[in-house]
Amino acid sequence: MAKREKKETFRTSIGGQALIEGILMRGPEKQAIVVRAPEGLVTKVEELKLVRDKYPILGLPIIRGVVTFLDSMVKGIKALMFSADYFPDDEAAQPSKFDLWLEKHVPAEKFQSILVTFSLLLSLALCLGLFMLLPTFVAGLFHAQSALVHNLIEGAIKILIFIGYLFLCSRQKDVHRVFQYHGAEHKTIFCYEAGLPLTVENVRPQPKHHPRCGTSFLFVVIIVSILVSSLVFPYINWQNIWVRIGVKLLLLIPVVGVTYEFNRFVGAHDNAVTRILSAPGMWMQNFTTNEPDDSMIEVAIEAMKLVIPAEKGKDQW
């Protein structure tokens, strides 16, 4: 009897990010922002310029993960600012002293780049504070007698903080809508990968959890950091808190790089092993994705259509 051929599942490299009442989609050639503003759909399409295309060394394994992560953060912050401009909190509100200082001292043409840099540094500082400094100080209160036990305690604290942070975010009304757009983004990508026409009817029943999601990536970063710390700290002066913090900062680059390569591997294969490996990150998406309404799906479809390459297969994962 002839063996039945297993149909190869298409996986796209197109990915996205939920915005304020909108979605950012990134394809192999360009990125598109689509926002459902009060006056209707607003779109912004840009050619995708990657720094690793200019400097090939930045495309090497491990290094490319760090570069991609930082590039995604910068582009994501810019896209969030773009979408936020259509939904001011209070038009009648007086500008803050900080806003007035910026207007006076910062040239208009440099304003956005400075604001993006400030937002990026603030985001990185928040991540380091919540998921590195806080767990390190709290774990020190347990006075563990071995590096392994200390790392396990610290790792458990990191995971609890991560889950708690996502849970609290998901309870906010405005964030709940952002997470609905996140679900719409995932559903649209699944529909496209299945080879179905991009219609609301086809997108709606698709899963809202996707194995190549940024939530999964961040969770795996935490897990990899725990594993790497368990291998490194038994051989150094791990009881000195400042040594621990310094070493962790140095390990951030390989941790992010290894996580990126892990996600690429898991995203490229669909079998029992990769499904088990991706299961914890998929579960985390219960906090960061919600079922979207049809209007949100329409936004995701429009964003997807704008970045699908003309050359078939160019966006193969």
Model-flagged regions — what are they?
Residues M1-P88:
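Divalent-cation
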Residues E5-S13, A18-L19, R52-G59, L100-V116, ...:
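Cytosolic juxtamembrane amphipathic/interface segments immediately preceding
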Residues F111-G129, Q206-L231:
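Transmembrane alpha-helical segments and their cytosolic interface motifs
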